[in-house]
């Protein structure tokens, strides 16, 4: 790897990142959609295949998770207009937000209460389907609810699944795997919240805790799985299946926008702000949206100032060959879902030509935004889920991107969607603590 001093000369923004200041970065490597898609390792067919598989499993999901009965086994979340929060943001940051502001509430996804319910559950279902088909327990024409039987659970119990996680991915993989009957182990990093570990253990999941960070938990999970031929490892750093599970969100969002009579075209751009840890969730969602809306959707990743792994990987072009710790950033943040020091190389390289930009936000800001959203809209998210909330302010304030893309005239006819990635499963006492922190920081700021 190049010496840090050389990197700092080449990429002056690194100095601000090293000082853990908030930054806004416009991706110079973004290409027009038609150019970018030609070299993409994944295509629309891959996403459609994932969508069809989730439809096949819908009858099973509706049967074993009654909370999905209403949506007939489709795991989906609301898309809400948040006008009071928009007003508060404009007032607090003295910056008009041009266009409408909406919140995608993946915080309220059924089963595991976070965006990870998309990719994590999808990958487990795909693995279960492959095993069941191979062993003649299922055909693609069957009603998949037949998997809810003692025979199937006993069959899956002869196999195991492992994953490394800071929390939310572990919840979705753990809950889904245990429900099917698999033996499941979640390797959790030091920053994983206690309540997430407790919840998993209550579902019969084996939780192994590490003193080290996320990358170490993943490495250990991979090692355990490598030693056991019957163990399947969900690889958050490299998984195409996770990525595709997230990508399915796009066509669902398209339907919701249509229901709200919100147009997305050249004159009505769509801006989407996605909290980013290792990259799979935001990468998959952004990829899916690009397939649908092409150059009319503009996706931004949001990271904590102490864990800007994807930004550093993309900016330097080093991707997973560089970690935040290499340049003296500690990777310590209360945004546990985003506490990742080394980004996914697969996601970084796949998304590089599609991504509009990336910005960082401090933990203090996340808490203040958490309190503000609770006060204005009565919606409670976990700290990491608020990373997207400041995006519309940043894009409108630092208008370099809007100028570059000739969007200055169009933005007020556009729509901003903040992806709320988690929060509904946070225990009340923990959430009260978050709120109080936000309250104290708001008073301090004033």
Swiss-Prot record:
Its cofactor is pyridoxal 5'-phosphate. GO terms for biological process: D-serine catabolic process; isoleucine biosynthetic process. The modification N6-(pyridoxal phosphate)lysine is found at residue 116. Keywords: Lyase, Pyridoxal phosphate. One of its GO terms (molecular function) is D-serine ammonia-lyase activity. It catalyses: D-serine = pyruvate + NH4(+). Belongs to the serine/threonine dehydratase family. DsdA subfamily. The keyword Lyase applies. This is Probable D-serine dehydratase. InterPro entries: D_Ser_am_lyase, Ser/Thr_Dehydratase, Ser/Thr_deHydtase_PyrdxlP-BS, TrpB-like_PALP, TrpB-like_PALP_sf. NCBIfam families: D_Ser_am_lyase, PRK02991.1. It comes from Bacillus cereus (strain ZK / E33L). The keyword Plastid does not apply. PROSITE patterns: DEHYDRATASE_SER_THR. Its EC number is 4.3.1.18.
């Amino acid at each position: 790897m190049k010496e840090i001093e050389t990197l700092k000369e080449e990429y002056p923004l690194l100095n601000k990142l090293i000082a853990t200041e908030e930054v806004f970065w416009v991706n110079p490597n973004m290409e027009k959609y038609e150019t970018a898609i030609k070299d993409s390792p994944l295509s629309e067919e891959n996403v459609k295949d994932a969508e069809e598989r989730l439809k096949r499993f819908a009858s099973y999901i509706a049967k074993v998770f009654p909370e999905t009965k209403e949506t007939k086994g489709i795991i989906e979340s609301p898309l809400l207009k948040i006008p009071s929060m928009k007003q508060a943001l404009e007032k607090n940051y003295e910056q008009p937000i041009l266009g409408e502001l909406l919140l995608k509430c993946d915080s309220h996804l059924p089963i595991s209460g976070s965006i990870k319910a998309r990719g994590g559950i999808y990958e487990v279902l795909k693995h279960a389907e492959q095993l069941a088909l191979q062993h003649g327990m299922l055909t693609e024409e069957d009603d998949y609810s037949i998997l809810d039987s003692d025979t199937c659970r006993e069959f899956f119990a002869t196999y195991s699944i492992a994953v490394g996680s800071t929390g939310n991915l572990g919840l979705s993989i753990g809950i889904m795997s245990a429900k099917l009957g698999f033996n499941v182990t979640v390797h959790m990093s030091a920053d994983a919240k206690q309540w997430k570990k407790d919840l998993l253990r209550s579902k019969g999941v084996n939780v192994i805790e590490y003193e080290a960070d996320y990358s170490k938990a993943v490495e250990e999970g991979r090692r355990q799985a490598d030693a056991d031929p019957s163990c399947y490892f969900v690889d958050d750093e490299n998984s195409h299946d996770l990525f595709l599970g997230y990508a399915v969100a796009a066509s669902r969002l398209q339907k919701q926008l249509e229901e709200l009579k919100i147009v997305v075209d050249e004159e009505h751009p769509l801006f989407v702000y996605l909290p980013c840890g290792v990259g799979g969730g935001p990468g998959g969602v952004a990829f899916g949206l690009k397939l649908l809306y092409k150059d009319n959707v503009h996706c931004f990743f949001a990271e904590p100032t102490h864990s800007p792994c994807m930004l550093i990987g993309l900016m330097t072009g080093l991707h997973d060959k560089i970690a935040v710790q290499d340049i003296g950033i500690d990777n310590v943040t209360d945004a546990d879902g985003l506490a990742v020091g080394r980004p996914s190389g697969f996601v970084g390289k796949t998304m590089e030509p599609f991504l509009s930009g990336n910005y960082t936000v401090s933990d203090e800001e996340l808490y203040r935004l958490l309190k503000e959203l609770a006060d204005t809209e009565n919606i409670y998210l976990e700290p990491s889920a608020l990373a997207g909330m400041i995006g519309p302010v940043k894009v409108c304030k630092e208008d370099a991107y809007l100028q570059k893309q000739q969007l200055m005239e169009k933005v007020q006819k556009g729509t901003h969607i903040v992806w709320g990635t988690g929060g509904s499963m946070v225990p009340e006492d923990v959430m009260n603590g978050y709120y109080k922190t936000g309250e104290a920081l708001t008073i301090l700021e004033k």
